[in-house]
Amino acid sequence: MRMIQRERKREKEEGQLKERTVVNMADPDDNEAEATGLQQYSGETTRDDNEESMNDSFTLTSRNRGRSNTISSIVSGYEIMKEHMDKEKFMYLILASLLLYMGFVAAFAPRTSLSRDFRRFHSSRLTNAEVYRIYLNSLQQENRAKEHVYKYAGYMSNGASDSSTFKYTLDEFLDMGYKPKVEKYYPWIGEPVDTNVAPLENGKVVYEASMIEDRVKGDPASHARKRQKGFHQYSKNGSVTARYVFCNYGSISDYKLLLKKNIDIEDKIHIVRSGKILPGLKVKNAELYGASSVIIYTDPFDDGKVTEENGFLHYPYGPARNPSYIRRDSVNYFSDTPGDPTTPGYPSKDSDTEHMSPVGRVPRIPSVPMSARDVQPILERLNGRGFQIGPGSNIKDFGSFTGPSSSIDKVHLHNELTYNIKEMSSVEVSIPGIFTEGEIIIGAHRDSLASSSAGDANSGSAILLEIARGMSKLLKHGWKPLRPIKLISWDGERSGLLGSTDYAEAHAAILRRRALVYLNLDNAISGTNFHCKANPLLQDVIYEAAKLTEFNGHEDWSLFDHWKYTSNATISLLDGLSSYTSFQYHLGVPAAHFQFNANDTSGAVYHSNSVFDSPTWLEKFTNSDYKLHNTMAMFVGLTTLMLSENELARFNTHVYLKKIYNWYIAWHSNLSSAFPQDDEVNSLAKRVLDLLKVATQEDSIQFDQQNGILYKECREALPVWAFYKKIKSYIKLQRSNSKSKQIDQLFITHRGLKDREWMKYSLLAPSKFEGSVGEVLPGLHEGLADIDRNEVIQWLTILLSQFSNVRYLLQ
């Protein structure tokens, strides 16, 4: 209405201005005509009249010019005002049109979810289902695992710092279109020179052990021109001649029993069988109890039912263990402090990195491995001496007697390695994500202690390359993962987890901030039974991925079906045997380990760290068509994609805390028994139990339920005008993911475990006395084992604080 009134007022003023202009412009012309007519009429004028007339004319002209300038200014102002008014109207019109268009779009535009928006804004239009389908199809249509296994095995010398396997891995990544990054480290490591064992009778050599496997028919790996004798990485150089004693598995309990039975074990060569505990701890225990050196052999008795004693033929004619089998190993104490023993707690990043003395992290006595066949004549001479120890033995004519040997029966042992600083290289491929945090890391080592290594190193490396190939197909379809993904080929793992430990120590701050999960491939294919060790947080995503993975190409039989049929889909505890050690126990990054391994009752016996771990053995007794490799590549890749492609971290905190709660209940009863009259200990233990119970039965359930609701919100399609709801969901999403990533890190302690400061995870660690199994609540357990009241109180206080922080985090 006001605009109409202003318009009318403007038109009225405009009309008045025009009238004035017409009048003023007409007067000069009329006066001029009148003056001309008078002059013509009179016919003549006087000079005075002319002068007067000129003066009047000048005055009139000046007056008319002043009027003309004023009128021009008014007209100009009017035009400017008119132009301004037109622009204002135009802007109003534009604004109104824009609002109308936005309203139309808001009313009729397709609904979108927060999940889809993440991808649209980053030009990634593949849905989760399409991502899974493309990845699985790429691996189902082609399986290159056999090619990779043979390529790696063909180099026949894939130890630490091997250049051939490094170059092959690097070239494969480059051919797929990746830009791999090479990280070099410089650890202190040994190169085997010679090992020798010879039994002596009255000072004379009875025979010299071969210290190497037989050349067998049909297996090219055993006929390689360059073959390495059995050795122990990080064993002490030296030669020893002494009497010997059989010490069963070499555990602390075995040695306590030997001392209880008054067996003389001082300054003897201790012969122990492999199994039960890590080789390094066997040598460590032997050194502690006065051994001069150690021999470790593999007893077929520990192979279960598949033995020659039970009628099975040995390899290559049957599934039983070949009697000439020798297991090479590392004997550094990596269940205490993994990695380079001369750079504990920091990476050997440069060639001039300071290296400390390895004392306390490696043995100070020599040790060597032997075959069952070579050790048999030595053990046989112990019969009737000492007492019988252990569960039994399949060493021919040996009754498991401890000895020691007679004064005329001795063994000469020689061990020699050359120790130097060597360059090692890990190869890393990064796939950037839409999010900058929440990395999923997949790792596999390519080194081994024996040539070939088809089941151990080469299978894991082949599967890693197949996963990379499947993801390269996705990248060609314009895929960009929500979370970043890394694939890493480790070096030096079999020597003592060198590559992964150096990497974790070098990138500790970044990994704590960004890493979400570490997935490990080690000894990936050595049998047909699927086995999984994992942090309980990952249970749900592992089960879901297994259900969506076809087992060996069978559409109606999933990996989960096979897993449940063979072992009831059991997820075991992590131990201290592989590359996940640094991630889980040092940094608090949830980890999982996957493998197909042998069945003790019917499966072929696996020849670990031996020349018999060859493609021939693999194809003959385990995986002739390499479909297990294909199944594993699909499963691990699918697990990675499920973690990466979901906006919400796929962690189940209730399952996680329920496991911890059950663990603690077991230790709580032990605490009451160990300190029955100690009110302070029992009161503190009860407070921890009550706090953990509330966190498990209330906080974790509520947190998981809220995450379930949030998951649906992220997938809910909303109109454009409801963008504020997406903003609220996004804020909640960021907060939830941050909490999920922090939960495991809350159990990282600065002090670490007693005498194992590098192990900082208070919920789980490799067993201090076995190493090959995981130990729950290790600080509390070790304090209880030593009946150390101060240590128990310290760990109860730590757990009380940590569980309080968990409750606060989940609320």
Swiss-Prot record:
GO terms for biological process: protein targeting to vacuole; proteolysis. Its EC number is 3.4.-.-. CDD domains: M28_PMSA_TfR_like, PA_GCPII_like. It is found in: Membrane. Residues 1-63, 334-367 are annotated as: Disordered. GO terms for cellular component: endoplasmic reticulum; membrane. Its cofactor is Zn(2+). The chain crosses the membrane at residues 90-110. InterPro entries: PA_dom_sf, Peptidase_M28, Peptidase_M28B, TFR-like_dimer_dom, TFR-like_dimer_dom_sf. The keyword Protein transport applies. It is a single-pass membrane protein. Binds 2 Zn(2+) ions per subunit. Zn(2+) 2 binds at residues 445, 456, 522. Residues 336-345 have a biased composition (Low complexity). SUPFAM superfamilies: PA domain (SSF52025), Transferrin receptor-like dimerisation domain (SSF47672), Zn-dependent exopeptidases (SSF53187). GO terms for molecular function: aminopeptidase activity; carboxypeptidase activity; metal ion binding; metallopeptidase activity. Residues 1-21 have a biased composition (Basic and acidic residues). Zn(2+) 1 binds at residues 456, 607. Glycans are attached at residues 55, 237, 568, 599, 670. Keywords: Aminopeptidase, Glycoprotein, Hydrolase, Membrane, Metal-binding, Metalloprotease, Protease, Protein transport, Transmembrane, Transmembrane helix, Transport, Zinc. It comes from the Eukaryota. Involved in vacuolar protein sorting. Belongs to the peptidase M28 family. M28B subfamily. Present with 112 molecules/cell in log phase SD medium. This is Vacuolar protein sorting-associated protein 70. The lineage of its organism: Eukaryota, Fungi, Dikarya, Ascomycota, Saccharomycotina. The gene is VPS70.
